[in-house]
Amino acid sequence: MKLIPFLSEEEIQKLQEAEANSSKEQKKTAEQIEAIYTSGQNILVSASAGSGKTFVMAERILDQLARGVEISQLFISTFTVKAANELKERLEKKISKKIQETDDVDLKQHLGRQLADLPNAAIGTMDSFTQKFLGKHGYLLDIAPNFRILQNQSEQLLLENEVFHEVFEAHYQGKQKETFSHLLKNFAGRGKDERGLRQQVYKIYDFLQSTSNPQKWLSDSFLKGFEKADFTSEKEKLTEQIKQALWDLESFFRYHLDNDAKEFAKAAYLENVQLILDEIGSLNQESDSQAYQAVLAHVVAISKEKNGRALTNASRKADLKPLADAYNEERKTQFAKLGQLSDQITILDYQERYHGDTWKLAKTFQSFMSDFVEAYRQRKRQENAFEFADISHYTIEILENFPQVRESYQERFHEVMVDEYQDTNHIQERMLELLSNGHNRFMVGDIKQSIYRFRQADPQIFNEKFQRYAQNPQEGKLILLKENFRSSSEVLSATNDVFERLMDQEVGEINYDNKHQLVFANTKLTPNPDNKAEFLLYDKDDTGEEEESQTETKLTGEMRLVIKEILKLHQEKGVAFKEIALLTSSRSRNDQILLALSEYGIPVKTDGEQNNYLQSLEVQVMLDTLRVIHNPLQDYALVALMKSPMFGFDEDELARLSLQKAEDKVHENLYEKLVNAQKMASSQKGLIHTALAEKLKQFMDILASWRLYAKTHSLYDLIWKIYNDRFYYDYVGALPNGPARQANLYALALRADQFEKSNFKGLPRFIRMIDQVLEAQHDLASVVVAPPKDAVELMTIHKSKGLEFPYVFILNMDQDFNKQDSMSEVILSRQNGLGVKYIAKMETGAVEDHYPKTIKLSIPSLTYRQNEEELQLASYSEQMRLLYVAMTRAEKKLYLVGKGSREKLESKEYPAAKNGKLNSNTRLQARNFQDWLWAISKVFTKDKLNFSYRFIGEDQLTREAIGELETKSPLQDSSQADNRQSDTIKEALEMLKEVEVYNTLHRAAIELPSVQTPSQIKKFYEPVMDMEGVEIAGQGQSVGKKISFDLPDFSTKEKVTGAEIGSATHELMQRIDLSQQLTLASLTETLKQVQTSQAVRDKINLDKILAFFDTVLGQEILANTDHLYREQPFSMLKRDQKSQEDFVVRGILDGYLLYENKIVLFDYKTDRYDEPSQLVDRYRGQLALYEEALSRAYSIENIEKYLILLGKDEVQVVKV
């Protein structure tokens, strides 16, 4: 097919006008049309969230194919494999549709070929392209095409450790061993070993892997900061900072004296304020840096007098307290800044003094890193196994050094397209440059969504082009896609309100102006005031809520707040759970979130990437089993195996065995003691009774068989033998969350199999690999099991990128930013290279023996401080972008959830805004998202912000206030029995029919340790024949029951189940105020308070309730309310007589009267029945349990038991 020319600028403008004047319901924007059809130059599309960038890419590709370009002539890079597959699917549909629409035979044939070639097109991640490239051209570097990827983190760590120790030994024994020893000690820390150095080496290596040429960067940039260090310039900068700080302090104190000080006349602190003003006043234009430093020292010294209270306003007058507090707060802020500057003077002096020593240390580090990088590179070549970054490095090496290969790709690719360009790193950017001919790049992204700095992505790659193309269109075309087709106007307005005031070039790396603001474009979503974004704060005032570390088993106020809103959405507005997303910046609080959702029965689906696989109990048991098989002399692992469910040794048995020491041995490990016990070769052999001896023999025989089996079989076979021999796989399947536990065990076998297929063999090496992963505080990804279909989504903000949800809750707004990077011993920068903390040994000059002669001082190098400042700004910018991504996931409504003391938050004061932005110090001193949001709320109170904040206290978060999840079963109707007891009897009967005698005998043992309810105990232990008369769906008609031939009811009228009526009746009986005279009117008012639907309330017969209180029992209750206990929970330890296993019974007693020597127990039943004896038989066992619990609790034997039957038109009270 002959190439069709691309559109000129004039033709594009006409197309834009025609689109604007068309009658289409969903029109392309002018910018979208420009992005689709512009050609002949490099193009950067800055596409805000929800602006249709994927649509634009697909349309652009389709247009190029329709003009005769081959799909093989396009290089299209996506950020994920999923995105690549989605783009291919979209292109397949568009190409197919185009083929059907066109009458041009040549075009049909051409597009048909493109459709056939689509699976082989260069559409995918950069990693997938480089793998294919190296497979084809790797021979140029002597790399075999059958190389494999080191995707397994544990295998990679194993190789790294081996290489590290080889290089370490070479340097430790080499010619420069003294300087290397100094390097080693510098990072030794408390461990005083090589682990500190190893940690920093791996950190630097990961950084190097993101550069286009690691060895070149090490050579050219690693020491750059030391080479260009300018201490004179740093001192001048510091002097300017001191000047500004002293002027700020002077302004603050003068304002205080002129305005507020008269309220505190003759206060002692005012004299010191004047002293400081005199000190600062002594400075003039001629003052040098020494003079400023001297004044700073005097000022700080004055502030520290009187135990630091020399400048404190200690007024106790109630009416002046706010004024005094405001002064003291600002004074603390000012002097904190002065204290930091005073410290910086000292640090700068030490930095200059030890600069030469630190530089020497850095050179030693550079040498070690160079050797490590090369040795690790060679080792991976020997294994023919590479990391993804290695593949990219070799691809770049081939493209740079073999012009014929580079030129063939540059000629082949008509266009080099890249999605998510803001998350590109330098190695990827270099590759894109080499594949392009210099003017055929199409880059799509949004710098506001660059959130992968931890993967070495550099948003400045995007930003540099954005600025350059904006200033000089000849360099390239900049196109802005600002219209948002995803979210409601309420979501977009709130997002704009936040980032207009938060993000600029200084803090945020871009100025959030009209080029970046979101524009509402989804006309299908009409404005709705109910969808105004909400900033919800759990008020911690006077709640006494414990710190997070103490609340692992407690539902946090924050989560109860969220659950209340979720239930409101679900039950009042009919929102499906799957329409709700909970976003977190990290998974550190996920356990609390999952616990809270589980407590309220809310289904949840996680992102499936919790890296806690090795922490799961069933995997830990198996790992200890493998450790014992490898080496039974490991006491901890051996005890863990013996105590595990596979063998079940208890503490008493282990204690008896641990005393079996041979007489002639001083110390023996546990395994040797087990051998002694078997041989009866100990003076304490009398402790080994027959049952224990048999149990020990079985254990030792099985362990010996496993150890023998391990010598001749694969790890995979060994693991499955263990599962099968001890039924462990089946056992964990019966535990709570059984399918997930079995999936973990299955994955362990698969991971062992993969390990042995990767040229690593044997149990010892597998255990060593696992231990190294744990030692490095890493873990393996947890196994994902099938999630529920309708469930709330819980995921990190990173995982949510590219997704959208109608309702979004951003949780943990109060969670502090992670600043671990800035606390490291090493901080790297592309511009400055290595920043390091140098450990200097200093003479103290002490003469006395009890004083140390030398001390160690940690001195951050000048480059370290510069890199630290750079890192802080980059980190805050990334956190802002993370919040932007989170807020723009919402389609309809956005909730921002945090917590804090209302009193403290509302008393906070902030500096005035500048140019419509929060003060830069306010932004840089924020510890979390909440600090930013709250500051905006306070500073811009006069602005009509498009989000509101609301404090929610404990009184609004009680169980009653939150409510319960309403659950309904289609099998239940009003004719069925009280479902608290009988809703699973059918399943129980079917299960019992198939149960074997052994399982029946040991039923409690199988279930235990567990907690049972009375109805569960009844189901498990009462004879099946005693349940005669209970109607069970699908089990046939009960005797005397008439068969109905009525047509089924397909009406939409709300169905009311027996379970709902039963629950509502119990709640009503609990709520009735027995201190007042009971009337129909008072019962009606009480019924309104019951948490249920009106349809259920209408089914409750209040006359029948009133009639109960006319019975003998009812009158006794009314006359003895001071002896009455209602809805009382209990728990009781029971023993199963057949298996002799203990278990716990828990339940709730409807009510009882407690007298001195007698208890009257009663229980309400709403079951339908023919004869009272039916219910008496049915619930006899349950009441017997209640009776036993009360008898044990109060030591009273005389207990009367009554059933109050409400299932007929007339109430009946039956004594049991």
UniProtKB/Swiss-Prot annotation:
The protein in question is named ATP-dependent helicase/nuclease subunit A
Name the PANTHER family on file. Answer: ATP-DEPENDENT HELICASE_NUCLEASE SUBUNIT A, UVRD / RECB / PCRA DNA HELICASE FAMILY MEMBER
What are the residue boundaries of the UvrD-like helicase ATP-binding domain, all occurrences included? 26-488
Keyword terms: ATP-binding, DNA damage, DNA repair, DNA-binding, Exonuclease, Helicase, Hydrolase, Isomerase, Nuclease, Nucleotide-binding
From which organism does this entry originate?
Answer: Streptococcus pneumoniae (strain Hungary19A-6)
> So what EC number does this one have?
3.1.-.-, 5.6.2.4
One annotated GO molecular function is:
double-stranded DNA binding
Q: Which SUPFAM superfamilies match?
A: P-loop containing nucleoside triphosphate hydrolases (SSF52540), Restriction endonuclease-like (SSF52980)
According to the record's subunit comment, the protein's assembly and interactions are:
Heterodimer of AddA and AddB/RexB.
